[in-house]
Structure formats: C-alpha cells, structure tokens
C-alpha cells in the first residue's frame, strides 16, 4: 500500500513544484465578516480594501442554507445615512436566480443576474464570487457553486472609487436568521490565486467549462489546462494522505504495545533434546477498518472479518468503491442534437434548447439517468404564436418559420398587413349590401354602391324615392349619404338648406325663412324682409352682386362677389377690363401671337387673326381657322389633333411632348416604352425609369394607388388615367342655343348646384344645351332626371359625344304626343317616349335642326333615330328617373338604361354607331321648364362591355346564315 501512496505524494510534489516555479501567488488575506466572529472586520475598514486600485482580484466566499423557494439578501454593504447600496448579493428562490448589485464609478448601481441557480432548496451550499479588474474597467465576474463554476460575466463597468460618506457610516448587513436557515460562513479574501481561495472551502475546482487563461503565453495556457485535468486527481491524493496518516498512527500504536511486553524467556533443555527455537513470527498486521475512511467519499463502508468492504461508487462515478472516477455522461448524448452538454462532477447539464425550439434544461447524474432522460426540444410553431401578420400564409419549419403572401381572399403584405379582399364574384367575400352593387376597381379594390332607388354607404342601403343618393330615413352608418334626405320627393344631391330648418331649398316654399315665399322673394336664398332692390333687376340688394347695375344673369367670372357687370377686372388678373385682351380669362402675360387684340388664352384661333371670335358651329375653334377636316372623327380637326389618325377625343398628352398618349409609345417620357420591351412600363403615366415594384403586383410603387399622380386616389378618381379630370364638375359649361333665330321661345336658364353635380333649367325655352368642357373617349355617364312641375309636357334629356352644335348624340324624352307649332320648314310630330338620336346637321342650329329634333324619326341631313323605347310611355310629373349611359366610341358601342325607382323601365340594348367618335357631355331641354338633372356622375372607361362581344357574335351568325 505504501508504493501507491508514495507515488501520489511524489506526483503532488512535482505538480506543486512546477506551480511554484511558474510563480506562486501572494498569500491570501482573509477577512471574516460574520458578526459572531472575534476577528470581524469593521465595515468601514473594508472600503480601503475594496477601492484599492492596485487590487486585481477580490473574492467573497459564503456558506449558507435557505428554505425552499425563499428569498434573502445574503450580505450587503450599505450607507447607514441614506441606505444607498455599495455591494449586495441577493438570492431569489422562487425564480431560481441570484442578483449581484454594486455601485458603478458614475454613481449608479449596476445589476448582474445569475439564472437557473437552485440556492434556496433547504440544502447547504457554498458559493465563491471572484471579481476581477473592477477598478480598471472591463471587469469580469465568476460564480462558483459547491466548487463548480456555474457562470461568468465579462466587460463589467468600472466599480466605485470610494464613497462620499465617512468610513464610520458604512454598514455591513447579513440576512436575518429564520427557522431552518443559517449563514455559516462569510469571508472577504484579497490577493492569492483562485485555487488558494477555493481551498478555503475545501474545494479542488472542477469547472463546468474550460476557463480562459488569465495570463499570456503558451506556458500559462498549458499550465491551466493541466491544472484543470488534475483537479480530480488531487482530490484522490488528499484521500490517500488522510488514509496514510491513519495507518501510520495504527502502526505506531502496535509497535508501542509490543515493546511493553518485554524480552521473551526460554528454558534451556538438555543437550540431548535440544531443539533450536523457531524464529519469532512477524507481528500480524490487523485488518484495516472503516474507521480509517478507506472508501471514496459518500460510499458506504462495512466492516468485515477480513477488514472492510466498500459499497458501489456514487451515482455519476465508476470504480471499486475505494477509487471512483467521474463518469462523462455527455458521451451518452443526453442533450438534444446541437445543444451543448456540460459534464459536471458528478453529473451533467444540458444548455437551453436552440432558438425556435422549447424544452427543459435537463440536469442529472449517472449513466442510467442520461440514457433514460434525454433532453427533448420541441419545435415552436411560430405560426400559432402570430409570427406573421394575420391572414397571411405562415410556413412553420424546424426551428424557424417563413412568412408568405396573404391568404386567398386577402390583400396586402407582411409590412402593411393582410386585409379582407372584397370579392364581388364570391358571395362569401362580397361585403356589400344586398341592395348594393359590388364594383371591382383598379388593383383589386372593391367599392360598394347602393343600387338605383337605394342610398347609403354601400354596406347599408335604405330606400331613396327621389334617387338623389340620400335615403328617405336616416341609416345607422356614418357616411354623409347615410343622413336622412331633407327633400324626400325632390332630388337635391347637394342637400342645400339656406335657412337650416331641415327642409332642403329644393322643396322649401320659403327657402331663406324670411316669411316671403320663393315665388315672390327677390332673394330666394338670403333673408331679406324689406325686399329692397336699388337697380330694379330681379335680384334684391341683399343678394345682388351689382347693387346699382342691372344684371339679371349675376355672372361673376372671378368669384370675388362683384358681378361682371360692375367689376372693372372681371377675371381678377390685375388688368382692367378696358386694357385686358382676355377680360374673362386670367392672363397676366397678355400674350397675343396673331396680334388680333385677343389674347392667346381666350383666342379661338391663336395663330390666325380673328378679332370678332366668330364660332358658328360652337366647337371652340374660331371660324377663321376651322377647317372641319377630322380624319379620325374624334371632334378635333387634323391641324390641332395631337393624334390625327387615332381616335382620342380627350386629347390627353401626359408628357406634354405634343404627341397624344393614344399614339405615344412612351406616355411619361421616362425611357421605358408603354408596351414593348424593355417595357411594359409599370407606371405608364408617371416617370419611373427604375420601375420599382416592391410587392411585385405589376404596378410601380410610385403609382400604386394613384395611377395618374393627380393627388386623388384611384378609388374616388373619376378618371384614374387622366390627371386633368378628377371629379364630376359642370360648373364651367358652354351654353349652346339650337334655335338662335326668331322669338318662338326664350333661351334656357341654367342653374348649377352641388359643386357642378346638379343642374336645374328653369325656363320654358327654345332647344338648348349646357355642355361641359371636358371631352371623353370611352365614358360612363349617369344622372337623375326629374321634372319638378305639372306644367307642360315637352322634351328633356342629355347629350354625349358633343363635337359641335351640328354633331352630337342626344337622349330625349317626351311626355305626350304633340305636333310642333311652327310648321316651317316642315311639320314635325313628337311621339311620347325615350329616343336616342345621332345629330349630324348640315345646316346647324336653326329651324331645320329645331324641327328635326322635335320630330320622332329620321330627318335627312339632320338627325337619325337610332333607338326608341317601344313602350311609347312619357315621363311622369314629379317622378325621378335614373339613367345609365355607356359609350365606347372606338367600337361605336352605345347602351342606355332608364330606371324608375329600382325598376328598369327602358333599355336600348347594344346600339352600334360611329358617327361621333367621342366628345363632350351635357344636358338638353326643349320647351320644358323646371327640369332637374341631379347627382350627375361621369367616369372615364375604355373597357369594352361583355355584351358587345355577344352582340357581334349574334350579328355575325345572322349575317353568315
């Protein structure tokens, strides 16, 4: 037995000698901090130690026991005056955490948290805190629990240099004893090596992970590695030395007992029988017993007849009971693949599951435990935890996930979110009211519009008798069109109410509430009881924009409140009328290329002198330069048409290069062709040479929701591909009188309301038109038609494709059959019902065109009847009708429908005519007063309706047969 012990001692000697040769650390200086210690250090004396700038390493060692799940501050250094913390170590049992707080150099407290520590479990624990370089910055902290390193923290901020209080105000506090709790040891150690300090707790450190070398050079790294590997061997040497001391003591006692017996006495036999005595037997060594602690620590020892017998090695070790070697459970792969396994002495610990997985941090002892308690990490289904935006496709992968596009029925992306994609074709995804029409706009947007005879926001619709887009009763929605109609039976889409009495002006007999009925009131919409009228025109002073000048038209070009009749600068351009070459058109530059005295801004022939501005055919082109040569029939003569051979009545030229969009290969002039490679341009009307399209929907980012960049989003833009037209507006209009000669009747009087979306004609007049200035290619035109009187029974309607006063389409409705009272130039008979006519008059406005319009049927060289309602039913007094017109001049498609309430009462069906290839819109009257055209709407639309293809197929088959 001596040989192995001697070898172990020799090995220990060599290791220690090598350590000494490498340079031993200074002797540790130990301060006992327990209040019961006779050598207890005054807390104030700790400060010079803790704030010594030459101090590199500082150690705190403590032994304690806490009840399960309890929390306590083990020790701390505080100011007795303001209770501020300098240093504190706290255990939080319920959270399995420990917290170290210390005062930083900037006067703030720094906090270090140690997780997954079971310190409050009713068992005795030893901790060792090693703090390094805290006075120099970038310090580090190591925590050892029961002789095993469990955590380390680096790059700690610099600690305090010293307190502002006097040393005698510094106070050390330890945790208050409770039943079954105790603080056995609390010491502060300065200087010395980690292994020297650890030995104070009877620890030969077995680290959970390799320590980083604290010195520099290959020798120090090699030395620390060897010391780590020999930690366990040193523990065994300690056991052997303890056993050797006990055996040596036993031998000494045995020898002493033998000497006490004295020398042996022999009786000399006779020579004849002398037998030489046998040599004395060597003393018998007593068998070794359990009281000499021969077994490995923790192994049960049993005395036996022959000495002792050791039980099996503890769980986590392997050996014969005397010598037990730690088992590396990590070799049996107890941890989840990819998770770091840490071999402990004894036992093992698995790190946390990888990112994207969830599972326990397994810790145990022994091969059996490692084999039967494998760490299980379950993939986290991030898709169930809302990793992607709602209503988008989420693909869960092992340890991760991937977000995809929006689910079917939703639109958007991972940045904007996925919103329900309203789908008009799928009833389940159609959000509209059953009494509303679902319209799919550009880029998939859906708009709900209440059907004819209904009003509301499209999601909720209520009855609307007068079809002016306001319901008869208020609806439970917040949109403007959910409010109750203030004139239930008279269409008034502007809901004007001058006296705010809740009754709209259109149906209020005293609209201004001054006690004077409208028929006698000279200011119908302005309260004026005195009815004063200085200039004796039809407008009282309260509403007259020229008090002393008779002006029944009340025209005010610049909208400054002063009528043109008394305004010396009608257009408000700063140039007096007498000097202004365009008195009704603002033009401060007064440019006049042809020198005819009429500025270019208002000159109907800017390049040809025409001072009288004669325009017989009312096409806005002066007679002096009007050639009427129009190759493509779109209403623009070839000399001014920006696409002379391509139909483009709208004359849109986005890039202002003189070439209309309809014949321009690059409308926005950004270098990307509209259709051919390297196009097509994903923003045809907005320059974007880089063609950015972040959501890959084929529409460039710059024009995603506003294709023409006119600052009106496509959903409410009446012409999403024309920046010059955004809303329906007839406030600017041209009056065209179709029978200017004679005095058979007077000219029409037009009143425009609701910001240009409602027109009222008040007089029993000659045939006339109010024509807007916006020209259209394909267009949808709708409005509500209402005759608000029981007097007379003549024509009212609307026009489209207007090119000049001799060329336009008209839809006109007569109430009763009647022969025109002027028999010259021919007898004209009007039949009741709706008529669709193409006007192409060789004479233009006059008696021929007048009688041709009145007559139901074709009139040579004047009017062709394209369709007539076969019912021969006239309009009813004070009943509202809604019309819908579709015109696609590129193919000659025309279709018009009329509704009474929600009932379709007339439908022209598909009508093909190419007489006018586009033009302007307006309204028409002939000998009928008090006509209301309400809730007017137009919309650019070049899409060919589906029924056109059906019509072509049917007619082709008919022709083929």
Curated annotation (Swiss-Prot):
- Enumerate composition-biased segments (Polar residues): 640-652
- Per UniProt, residues of the TSP C-terminal domain are 731-945
Look up the signal peptide feature and give its range: 1-26
All residue ranges annotated as the Laminin G-like domain in the record: 27-192
The record's subcellular location field reads:
Endoplasmic reticulum; Sarcoplasmic reticulum; Secreted; Secreted, Extracellular space
Cystine pairings recorded for this chain: 290-301, 295-310, 313-324, 330-341, 335-350, 353-377, 383-394, 388-403, 406-418, 424-438, 432-448, 450-461, 477-482, 487-507, 523-543, 546-566, 582-602, 605-625, 643-663, 683-703, 719-940
According to the record, glycans are attached at 612, 941
Annotated region (Disordered), positions in chain: 579-672
Q: Which GO terms describe its molecular function?
A: calcium ion binding; growth factor activity; heparin binding; integrin binding
Q: Where do we find the motif Cell attachment site here?
A: 562-564
Q: Where this protein primarily resides, as one coarse class?
A: endoplasmic reticulum
Q: Would the keyword Glycoprotein turn up in this protein's UniProt record?
A: yes
Which Pfam family is an annotated match for this chain, by its short name?
A: COMP
Key word Signal present in the record? Answer: yes
Instruction: Fetch the InterPro entries from UniProt.
Output: ConA-like_dom_sf (IPR013320), EGF-like_Ca-bd_dom (IPR001881), EGF-like_dom (IPR000742), EGF_Ca-bd_CS (IPR018097), Thrombospondin_3-like_rpt (IPR003367), Thrombospondin_3_rpt (IPR017897), Thrombospondin_C (IPR008859), TSP/COMP_coiled-coil (IPR024665)
Q: Where are the annotated TSP type-3 repeats, by residue?
A: 463-495, 496-531, 532-554, 555-590, 591-613, 614-651, 652-691, 692-727
In this chain, composition skew of type Basic and acidic residues spans 586-596
One GO BP on record is: behavioral response to pain
What does the record give as the function of this protein? Answer: Adhesive glycoprotein that mediates cell-to-cell and cell-to-matrix interactions and is involved in various processes including cellular proliferation, migration, adhesion and attachment, inflammatory response to CNS injury, regulation of vascular inflammation and adaptive responses of the heart to pressure overload and in myocardial function and remodeling. Binds to structural extracellular matrix (ECM) proteins and modulates the ECM in response to tissue damage, contributing to cardioprotective and adaptive ECM remodeling.
State whether it acts alone or in a complex, and with which partners, per the record: Homopentamer; disulfide-linked. Interacts with PTBP3. Interacts with NOTCH1. Interacts (via EGF-like 3; calcium-binding domain) with ATF6 and facilitates its processing, activation and nuclear translocation.
Q: What is the similarity comment for this entry?
A: Belongs to the thrombospondin family.
**Name of this chain's protein:** Thrombospondin-4
Q: What is the lineage of its organism?
A: Eukaryota, Metazoa, Chordata, Craniata, Vertebrata
